[in-house]
Design a protein with these regions (language model features):
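Catalytic nucleophile loop of clan PA
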Residues: 293-294, 299-304, 430-456
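Protease-domain processing segments flanking chymotrypsin-fold serine proteases, especially trypsin-like
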Residues: 19-149, 192-296, 301
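Non-cytosolic beta-sheet module surface loops
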Residues: 150-152, 162-166, 283
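Extended extracellular/luminal ectodomain segments enriched in beta-structured repeat modules
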Residues: 143, 152-159
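Short, surface-exposed beta-strand/strand-loop-strand elements in extracellular ectodomains
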Residues: 166-182
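Positively charged n-region of N-terminal signal peptides that target proteins for export
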Residues: 1-4
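Serine endopeptidase catalytic core focused on the charge-relay Asp
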Residues: 205-425, 434
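Bacterial N-terminal signal peptides
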Residues: 7-16
Length: 488
């Protein structure tokens, strides 16, 4: 028996949950004989609340304005941004042609919601930001600091890409945006140097200018520093909370039939929604949105922060390293259109499992999830036809929504070149969109909590065609890949 302590505001509840092996004899056998496993599962777990104040980060050095290196990037053109928005809009309107019906629905290939495009460095700018070209000043602690600013004109937010060689021990790099100068991200040099392929992407900061401060433990270390800015991702939509510009990634945001999670009368669905987060990541300088779900595991000694999402969102360690997560991005009221207080975590993730044909990706965050986050349960058995389904997601990058439907069949996706077998789901409330990709479908366990069963590949659902199916990955068919991490 695994004893889990659930921490929630204003109350402390003790939740006793059976581990996978204890529950195996009571689990109903799956109807689909393709499953590799029959009854392995996990229940929910809440991360403890931590009321300690986080340290206030700040730039440690004072660099006079005339000593700050400043460069401007070659930003994407207005036409480039317009085309990206058109592409997003095309995904949003994928379901039914004007005047068409459900039978005319065109399947939506898998597609993350794009919110950023590459911005490029000139050779002159690259040379100007080389460590030996910066002005280094004493930091008052025996070390040295240098600062530089990079601008991509009219960006709503920005992140820098670095080629990483040697980072001296004890180095710290700090990042801040000009539109939110009280939010400073401090990254240990060891974390930057630890990327597998020598490519590092900074945290996303708000505004069109990012300021970078490099602090070295010894002034002599500047001769050993190998850190080169090679470009940036210019975000044309702001991924931060309470910002309606994100909705302009498409012309109108998510579709009109989407339902805020706050509208749900299902307390178990509202609870598991705390495991669902918005994912922002960067591929080749372009930035995208998908949805992910924090998963529990059956190990008693540790609770590792695994995220279940989609292979078509993140399929390489390089991209997983760019991951930035947005938690509790949801309205507190049924009719709300903006998020309440939310939490942003940078730092990337380790890629643990990814599989093209099943469209499954499992990552492990490089830092703990925020205080009070929920680790969702999961069930690796097959889902029977006509089972009720709940989907929780961020359509078009919008605040968290809930969709209700039914698993109707097992199917090949019919698009995207993938050959796996998937769950087919039709909705009676809500639908999915670009940005929903990777989001989970859940079924209720015998305890009454929700368990993850798969993640969104794509589909053809639309507000005017809720009966047009969406396609979800099947955890049961690839649990042999997931088991070493989720049920070691």
């Amino acid at each position: 028996m695994r004893k889990l302590i659930v921490f929630i505001p204003l109350a402390i509840l003790s939740l006793s949950v059976s581990a996978a092996a204890d529950r195996a004899n009571n689990a109903a056998p799956p109807e689909n004989t393709e499953s590799f496993v029959t009854s392995v599962e996990s229940e929910i777990y809440y991360a403890p609340l931590d009321k300690r104040a986080l340290p206030q980060e700040r730039f440690v050095g004072f660099t006079p304005a005339h000593m700050v290196a400043r460069v401007s990037l070659i930003a994407p053109t207005a036409n480039d941004i317009k085309q990206a928005r058109i592409d997003n809009e095309r995904v949003a309107k994928r379901g039914i042609a004007a005047g068409g019906d459900a039978e005319s629905a065109v399947p939506r290939d898998e597609r993350a919601q794009q919110i950023g495009l590459p911005a490029y460095m000139s050779e002159t700018a690259t040379r100007g930001l080389a460590p030996n070209a910066l002005t280094w000043l004493p930091d008052g602690l025996g070390g040295a600091v240098a600062r530089f600013d990079v601008t991509s004109a009219d960006a709503k937010a920005i992140r820098l890409g670095f080629n990483v060689g040697n980072i001296p021990r004890g180095a710290t790099v700090r990042f801040v945006g000009d539109a939110e100068n009280d939010r400073i991200f401090a990254v240990a040099g060891a974390d930057i140097a630890g990327t597998e392929d020598g490519e590092y992407w900074s945290p996303i900061v708000l505004g069109d200018t990012i300021s970078v401060e490099i602090q070295l433990r010894s002034a002599r270390d500047r001769n050993a520093l190998e850190l080169e800015v090679f470009g940036a991702s210019h975000l044309f939509a702001n991924p931060a909370q309470n910002d309606n510009d994100l909705l302009k990634a498409t012309k109108a945001g998510s579709q009109s039939c989407e339902v805020n999670i706050a509208c749900s009368s299902d307390s178990a669905a509202k609870a598991v929604a705390a495991a669902v987060m918005r994912l922002v990541f960067t591929k080749g300088g372009s930035s995208f949105l998908c949805t992910g779900t924090l998963l529990n595991d059956t190990a008693t000694a540790t609770t590792r922060p695994f995220i279940y999402s989609a292979n078509h969102c993140i399929s390489t360690s390089t991209v997983a390293n760019t991951l930035q997560t947005f938690w509790n991005y949801q309205s507190s009221t049924c009719g709300g259109t903006t998020s309440g207080p939310s939490t942003t975590l940078a730092g990337g993730a380790f890629l643990r499992v990814t599989d093209f044909n099943s469209d499954i990706t499992l990552m492990e965050m490089k830092q703990p999830p925020p205080s009070g986050a929920l680790f969702a349960g999961w069930n690796a058995g097959a889902v029977a036809n006509n089972t009720g389904i709940v989907g929780i997601h961020h359509p078009a990058g919008d605040i968290k929504k809930i969709s209700l439907g039914t698993m109707t069949n097992n199917a090949a996706p019919g698009f995207s070149g993938k050959t796996g077998t998937y769950y087919q789901v039709v909705w009676n409330s809500g639908v999915t969109e670009g940005g929903s990709s990777g989001s989970a479908i859940f079924t209720k366990s015998t305890s009454g909590s929700y368990q993850l069963r798969g993640g969104l590949l794509g589909g053809s659902s639309f507000c005017n065609a809720q009966s047009s199916p969406d396609i979800y990955s099947r955890m049961d068919l690839k649990f042999n890949l997931l088991q070493p991490f989720l049920a070691p």
